[in-house]
């Protein structure tokens, strides 16, 4: 009987730290002994950079444009600790759908049965989550990923993107689509930021997988073209990423989230905005102040 490969998708608004988080999860899983492939699904094609010393790799779409026949191994490159790296890529500027690269790339690797050949334990799709359009929704819509996680901060636009993803998951949940594993709360340093994310998670009926603080160790590692797991494996930040990776290993049951309507989300955000104004003015709201 063939080994079951655990396939997960990690979504997040551009600039939220999605690729940083994904690469550190991949690195942590690899260090723990799992065979991992990281599949970059962003037209910027930089998902796997910190797994390969800061180097870009040829994308699937670029390779298909250059060659008539493409073998899957033409687009798979080895990174830190044997992690397999793939970048879907995007169309030429101004032409076509950016999400098309995901559809084409997944089809290429599946047709050639690469996941089974490499005896993978995990395939992690790093997906742009600003817009869950046709191409970018593939891991959710087609049920390619078994579990979906989203990276967000306490910033409104990051939560807005997460809520949009929840709408997509909810829409496809009755058609065999992937379900939500939980939220990865990133750049959580202030007590009020944790309170905001916790409140959002409670209202959308999901869970926080891990709180990841902003850390200079991440910046230092990325300037070297490395993950924190590789550059500073004994740091507190590396331990947080390892904890997150273990929680993903242990995770078995994903659920359908309950997204907020746009008007509800706007009203909720406005109420939090008022609490933060009170906090800044010295009128300490227990929720906004983290019960300090």
Curated annotation (Swiss-Prot):
<keyword id="KW-0547">Nucleotide-binding</keyword>
<feature type="modified residue" description="ADP-ribosylarginine; by dinitrogenase reductase ADP-ribosyltransferase">
    <location>
        <position position="100"/>
    </location>
</feature>
<dbReference type="Pfam" id="PF00142">
    <property type="entry name" value="Fer4_NifH"/>
</dbReference>
<dbReference type="InterPro" id="IPR030655">
    <property type="entry name" value="NifH/chlL_CS"/>
</dbReference>
<dbReference type="InterPro" id="IPR027417">
    <property type="entry name" value="P-loop_NTPase"/>
</dbReference>
<dbReference type="GO" id="GO:0051539">
    <property type="term" value="F:4 iron, 4 sulfur cluster binding"/>
</dbReference>
<dbReference type="GO" id="GO:0016163">
    <property type="term" value="F:nitrogenase activity"/>
</dbReference>
<dbReference type="GO" id="GO:0046872">
    <property type="term" value="F:metal ion binding"/>
</dbReference>
<keyword id="KW-0560">Oxidoreductase</keyword>
<keyword id="KW-0013">ADP-ribosylation</keyword>
<keyword id="KW-0479">Metal-binding</keyword>
<keyword id="KW-0067">ATP-binding</keyword>
<keyword id="KW-0411">Iron-sulfur</keyword>
<feature type="binding site">
    <location>
        <position position="97"/>
    </location>
    <ligand>
        <name>[4Fe-4S] cluster</name>
    </ligand>
</feature>
<feature type="binding site">
    <location>
        <begin position="12"/>
        <end position="19"/>
    </location>
    <ligand>
        <name>ATP</name>
    </ligand>
</feature>
<protein>
    <recommendedName>
        <fullName>Nitrogenase iron protein 2</fullName>
        <ecNumber>1.18.6.1</ecNumber>
    </recommendedName>
</protein>
<comment type="function">
    <text>The key enzymatic reactions in nitrogen fixation are catalyzed by the nitrogenase complex, which has 2 components: the iron protein and the molybdenum-iron protein.</text>
</comment>
<feature type="binding site">
    <location>
        <position position="133"/>
    </location>
    <ligand>
        <name>[4Fe-4S] cluster</name>
    </ligand>
</feature>
<dbReference type="InterPro" id="IPR000392">
    <property type="entry name" value="NifH/frxC"/>
</dbReference>
<dbReference type="InterPro" id="IPR005977">
    <property type="entry name" value="Nitrogenase_Fe_NifH"/>
</dbReference>
<keyword id="KW-0004">4Fe-4S</keyword>
<keyword id="KW-0408">Iron</keyword>
<comment type="subunit">
    <text>Homodimer.</text>
</comment>
<dbReference type="GO" id="GO:0005524">
    <property type="term" value="F:ATP binding"/>
</dbReference>
<keyword id="KW-0535">Nitrogen fixation</keyword>
<dbReference type="GO" id="GO:0009399">
    <property type="term" value="P:nitrogen fixation"/>
</dbReference>
<comment type="similarity">
    <text>Belongs to the NifH/BchL/ChlL family.</text>
</comment>
């Amino acid at each position: 009987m063939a080994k079951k490969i655990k396939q997960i998708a990690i979504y997040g608004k551009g600039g939220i730290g999605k690729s940083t988080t994904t690469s550190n999860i991949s690195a942590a899983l690899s260090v723990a002994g799992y065979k991992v492939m990281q599949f970059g699904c962003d037209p910027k094609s930089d998902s796997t950079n910190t797994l390969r010393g800061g180097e870009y790799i040829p994308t699937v779409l670029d390779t298909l444009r250059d060659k008539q026949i493409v073998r899957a191994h033409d687009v798979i490159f080895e990174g830190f600790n044997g992690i397999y790296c793939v970048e879907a890529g995007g169309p030429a500027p101004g032409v076509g759908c950016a999400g098309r690269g995901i559809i084409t790339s997944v089809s290429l690797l599946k047709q050639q049965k690469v996941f089974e050949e490499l005896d993978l334990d995990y395939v992690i799709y790093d997906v742009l989550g600003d817009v869950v359009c046709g191409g970018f929704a593939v891991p959710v819509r087609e049920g390619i990923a078994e579990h979906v996680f989203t990276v967000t901060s306490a910033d409104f636009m990051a939560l807005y993107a997460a809520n949009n993803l929840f709408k997509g998951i909810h829409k496809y949940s009755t058609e065999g689509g992937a379900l939500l594993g939980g939220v990865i709360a990133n750049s959580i340093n202030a007590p009020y930021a944790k309170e905001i994310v916790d409140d959002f998670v409670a209202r959308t009926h999901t869970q926080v997988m891990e709180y990841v603080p902003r850390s200079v160790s991440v910046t230092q590692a990325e300037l070297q073209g490395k993950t924190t797991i590789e550059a500073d494996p004994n740091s507190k930040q590396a331990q947080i990423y390892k904890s997150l990776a273990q929680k993903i290993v242990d995770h078995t049951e994903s659920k359908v989230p309950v997204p907020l309507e746009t008007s509800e989300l706007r009203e909720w955000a406005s109420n939090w905005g008022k609490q933060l104004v009170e906090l800044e003015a010295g009128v300490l709201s227990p929720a906004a102040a983290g019960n300090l």
